[in-house]
Amino acid sequence: MLLKVLVFLIASVSLFWVPTESSIAEDSVDDGGDGNAWLHYAGADGPGQGKHVVLIAAEQEYRSEESMPMLARVLASHHGFDCTVLFSVNAKGEVDPTLPAPFKDKSRRHHIPGLEQLKEADCVIWLSRFMQLTDAQKQLFHDYFDSGKPLIALRTANHGFWGGKPYLSGGKNVSLRELLGGTFHGHHGGWHREATRGEIVEENKGHPILTGVRDIWGTSDVYRCHNEQHPFPNDCTPLVLGQPLVSLERDAAPNTKKEPLPIAWTKVWTGNEGRKSRILHFTMGSAVDFENTGVRRLTINGVYWGLQMEDQIRADRTVDVVGEYRPNKAGSNYEELGVTPRPVSDYRD
C-alpha cells in the first residue's frame, strides 16, 4: 500500500518531466481508418442536439473502456448529444487497458487515435491515467484547456498524464492540481477495500448539477485530493463529500475513523486566451460506480451545466442505461478479471 502511494506521489512530482527521444519507443499504431479507431453515436431528439461531446477512455484500472461508451449512449439516446468515444490503443489499434503505466515501462508512449476531435468538441468528459503522450497529442489537450469549453474530469484525470510537454500559462507550468482544483495525494478510503457513499454539501444543495441527485454510491474509494500545503481552493465550489465505508457492500456502515472529503466540485478555469471554462471534477468514476443512478445523473447534469444549459436540467430527465451494462470490476489483475486487448467495435453496444 505504502509503495503504491509513493509511486503516485512521485508521479505527481514528475508530471512535467520531459523524456528524451531516446527513452521513448514510438509504436507504429494501426488506427484502422476513420470510424474504426473510435466510436460515434449520433444524437437523437433532445436538448443536446447540435452539441458534440467527446469522451476519453485512457487508463488501466477503472474500466473506462466500458463506462465511457455506456455514458455516450445515454447522452446520445436520451439527451440528443452527438458523442464520440476515444480510446488509448496498442500498436494493433486495439483498446488495451493492459498497457503498462510509464513507471512500469518508461519506454512506453501511449496513443489516443482521433484526439484531433477535441478541436471541434463542445464538451469533453475525460478519464485518463498516467498517459505518456506525444507532444502533438498533449498540445491538443492544452489547446482545449485554453478553449473556454467545459471539462468534466473523472477519477484519475487529476493524474491523467505522465511527463511530456508541459501546459504553460503566463510562461509558468500549470499542474493538473491547478487546472482541476485538486490532485491525487493518496487513497483516503481503503484501496479496493472501502466503498464510497456521497454526501451532498448542504449549503450547495441547490446547485444545478445536484438536481435530482438523491443517492451516490460506488465501490471506488475516496481520494485525498487536498492537504495542508494545498488545501481545498477558495475558487472551487464543493458539491459532494465522500464518506469511506467499512467494506465494498452497498449497505456497509461508514468508517467512522475517516472523515468525509470532497469528491465533486466545480471551478472556472481561465486559459491563455482569456476564455473561461467551466470545470467539474468528480473523483468517483469506475465502471461499477456508473451503475449507480446518482453517479450517472451528476455526471450528465455536469455536461448541461458546463455548456451553460442549466435551464435544461430536470430531475425527471432519464439517465437510464441504454442496452445491457454489466461492467467489470476495477483492478489490474487482468487475467483474473478477463480484461484483454479488444477491437474498438467490441465496445459499441
Positions of predicted regions on the chain:
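Extracellular ligand-binding/catalytic regions of CAZymes and related secreted enzymes
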Residues: 26-48, 66-67, 77, 93, ...
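Bacterial N-terminal signal peptides
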Residues: 4-18
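A glycine-rich, often tryptophan-bearing local segment used as a flexible ligand/cofactor-contacting loop or short
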Residues: 117, 126, 130-212
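Catalytic beta-strand/loop cores that center a nucleophilic Ser/Cys/Thr
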Residues: 30-38, 76, 82, 109, ...
